Design a protein with these regions (language model features):
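Post-transcriptional modification and biogenesis factors for structured RNAs
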Residues: 1-161
Length: 161
């Protein structure tokens, strides 16, 4: 089981503040074999809430950062591409990304999404195509869709052996 962990695939939550969303992202990360996620919280309050609310914390380490700049520089130092979930003219369908490369998926805050600073630091904007009237999914649902596409590609490539 531990040999199947994906050390070069992670999620970074930028000020995702609802404990049930944080917990769901962490549980999904564990389900696809991610052993650590990153979270940006400027204050100490959310760190306490997430540590008490996320049951998967015993399997998935949450690495906290005070700024998005710190978080992105940490994952880029590990050679990861940083993908921002953001509806923009430059965004591409999340299924067109090569997730067999070292990857960090940046998920924004529930209400306002990803900050301008984070978007400037990201390598690529990605979108989940929406055919209905709504323009976004819940952060935990969106992260699950993207992570399972990453898992699918990595399984085909034999990265879970």
């Amino acid at each position: 089981m531990l040999a199947r962990r994906q050390h070069d695939l992670t999620v970074c939550m930028e000020q995702v503040h609802k404990p049930h969303n944080v917990s769901a992202v962490i549980r999904t990360a564990d389900a696809v074999g991610i052993h650590h996620v990153h979270a940006v919280w400027p204050g100490d309050r959310m760190r306490t809430m997430v540590s008490s609310s996320a049951g998967s914390n015993s399997w998935v380490k949450v690495i906290t950062h005070r700024t998005i700049g710190d978080a992105v520089s940490t994952v880029k130092a590990q050679g990861m591409q940083v993908l921002a979930t953001n509806l923009s003219d430059n965004a591409i369908d999340f299924r067109e990304i090569d997730y067999t490369l070292p990857t960090c998926i940046l998920m924004g805050q529930e209400k306002t999404g990803i900050t301008r600073e984070a978007l400037a630091l990201a390598d690529q904007d990605i979108i989940i195509p929406m055919l209905g009237m709504v323009q976004s999914l819940n952060v935990s649902v969106a992260s699950a869709l993207i992570l399972y596409e990453a898992q699918r590609q990595r399984q085909i490539a034999g990265m879970y052996q």
